[in-house]
């Protein structure tokens, strides 16, 4: 399982070389560190975690697992940032495409995440992976809630 996130991110970067991202192995290691037992990475990609197209030093790795969406960024000197978005906290996903790059906006109950400087060719792939997973998981949550009410 070690380095599986890095391999998926590297494959993404090879498919979509226009995406601006640095230090992918370090960021991927943070996600590997926080995976729960039995948790598997379904899809992973890299982007800048900001809304400024000129800020290209805030790379983050985003991993969709069979339980949640993880966003990790390793600091240069020490420490890191990790966000975990479970399907019950997920509200909406918005994609915008510019001349060169595109953005992915993830709206949750508690925060609004902006991922930028993503190759335009990757936007449909990212939207399909995240949306289809979250829709299926939300159905499961609703079903569990209905069973609890009965």
What are these regions (language model features)?
Residues 57-71:
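Polybasic phosphoinositide-binding surfaces of eukaryotic membrane-targeting domains
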Residues 37-54:
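The phosphoinositide-binding surface of pleckstrin homology
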Residues 1-17, 21-24, 28-36, 54-57, ...:
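Acidic, Ser/Thr- and proline-rich intrinsically disordered linker/docking segments
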Residues 28, 45-49, 68, 75:
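Short glycine-rich, polar/acidic loop-and-turn segments at beta strand-coil junctions
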